[in-house]
Structure formats: C-alpha cells, structure tokens
C-alpha cells in the first residue's frame, strides 16, 4: 500500500497534513511531477515539494520530463526516486526523459507503464526499447545509457524503487523465485549472442516461454497455465460493452 498525492492541485495545508499522516504510517508516497509544459507553466511540483521539505527516499516521482536542472539536483540531494513511463512521454508529447542525467546524479530510477489507457499496452520489452531510444534522442549519445543499464532499470532497479529489492528483482538465494524464460532460438532473436541486447532491442512477449512468480508456474511452453485467456477476453468485452451502454455512448 502507498499514497498518491498531487501538491499544486490541492491547498498546501491539505497536502502537508496528508503527507504527515502517511509518513506516520510508514507508507511510501508516489507523485506525478513535471509531466507536461502545461503543468510547469502553472506550478513546479518538484520545487514546491523541495521547499516544503517533503522530498525524500520514500517518495517516487513519476515522469519529470520537464524538470529543470535545479529540480533534478533537488531530487538527487534528497535521494528522491523517479519512475519513468516512456510510452506516456511519447504518446502525450510530454517531453524527452532526462534518464542519463538523472543516473549521473545518482537518482534511483525505474521504468513503468503509467497507464495502459494512454500507452496502449504493458509490454516491458517495448518499454525498455523505447526508453533507450528516447534517451538517445535526449542525449544525442548512443553510448550514454546502454542495453544492460536499461535491463537493470526494468528489473532490480524497479524493486529498489519500490523498496522490495530484498525480496525480488534479481536471481539471488533467499529471494522469491520470479523468473521469465525467453526463447533464444526464435527467428527474431537468433542467433543468441548478447543477452542484454537481445532482451532490450529484439525480444517480444511472443518469445516468453515460461513465467514463474514466487515459485508458481503461470506460463509454460508459451501457454498461460493460471487462467483461461479466452474467458478473460470475453468477460472484458462484456464489461466494456456494459459500461458503454450505461454511459449512453456507441458500442
């Protein structure tokens, strides 16, 4: 459990009290910040949080594509985390992420989907690939952040960002048995050579052979084992049509 807040949209007295109560419960805090030019024209959330002494290692900022150099410095100084959603950055023309700069400053970063409503899917292979490409465009340097670093952002750094790296995020004795096995002899990934390059720049969900979560096999030989995919799709379609009918829209 965590808390999602939006200082800048709510009165200072309200969000300060909210954060005080949430921190009293020991819960992590997530906060959208610097997503769009329109937002920073109204207020700069990161600067607001910094001046209110609210930033810290228990805070995860989402986006920050339009954070100023000074604001990125504030994040580094306070050890505030940053989760970057590259699909949102490109789909909404929000801006190019400052991934390379944030990593150089020592900011704990990770990758995220944000919302499938905006991004269209939750394919982490595509998210890794897009993040790498957007960073190339931002830095104009294809060597600044490379495939292995992107893979870390999607795995162990995601766990670190969420404060659960002691349980998941890497293949380590004592951690949960979370595994994704990718075929390396499929046409689009063969011949196998560089694991990080293969996963970040070539692999697709189709190439996933087996998925094990906390020791439970959820996918095997390319087939889902824990649910009936056809049933899920059918129920989702029924729910969608019912919602459209209630809203009075076309379906």
Q: Where are the regions that the model predicts?
A:
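Histidine/acidic residue-rich metal-binding segments in metalloenzymes
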Residues: 1-81, 93-109, 166
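Short, charged, surface-exposed secondary-structure boundary motifs
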Residues: 92-97, 120-122, 191
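Active-site microenvironment of metallo-dependent hydrolases
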Residues: 154-251
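Short, electropositive alpha-helical surface patch
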Residues: 18-23, 81, 85-91, 238-246
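His/Asp/Glu-enriched, well-ordered alpha-helical/loop segment
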Residues: 51-58, 100-186, 202-204
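Short, acidic/turn-prone active-site loops that include or flank metal/cofactor-
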Residues: 35, 86-91, 114-117
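Glycine/Thr-rich phosphate-binding loops of Rossmann-like dinucleotide-binding domains
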Residues: 70, 91-92, 190, 221
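Flexible loop residues that form catalytic
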Residues: 64-65, 136, 185, 216
């Amino acid at each position: 459990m965590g808390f999602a807040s939006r200082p800048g949209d709510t009165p200072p007295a309200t969000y300060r009290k909210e954060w005080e109560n949430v921190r009293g419960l020991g819960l992590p805090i997530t906060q959208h910040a610097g997503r769009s030019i329109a937002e920073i024209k109204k207020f700069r959330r990161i600067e607001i949080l910094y001046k209110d002494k609210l930033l810290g290692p228990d805070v995860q900022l989402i986006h920050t594509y339009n954070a100023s150099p000074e604001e990125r410095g504030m994040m580094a100084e306070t050890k505030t985390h940053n989760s970057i959603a590259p699909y949102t950055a490109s789909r909404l023309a929000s801006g190019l992420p400052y991934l390379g700069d944030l990593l150089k400053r020592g900011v704990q970063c990770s990758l995220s989907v944000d919302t499938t409503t905006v991004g269209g899917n939750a394919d982490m292979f595509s998210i890794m690939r897009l993040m790498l490409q957007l960073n190339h465009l931002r830095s104009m340097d294809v060597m600044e952040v490379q495939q292995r670093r992107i893979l870390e952002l999607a795995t162990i750094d995601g766990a670190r960002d969420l404060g659960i790296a002691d349980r998941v995020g890497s293949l380590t004795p004592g951690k949960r048995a979370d595994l994704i096995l990718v075929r390396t002899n499929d046409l689009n990934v063969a011949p196998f050579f560089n694991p990080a390059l293969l996963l970040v720049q070539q692999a697709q969900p189709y190439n996933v052979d087996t998925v094990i979560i906390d020791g439970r096999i959820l996918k095997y030989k390319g087939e889902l084992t824990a649910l009936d995919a056809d049933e899920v799709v059918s129920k989702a379609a029924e729910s969608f049509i019912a919602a459209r009918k209630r809203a009075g829209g076309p379906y």
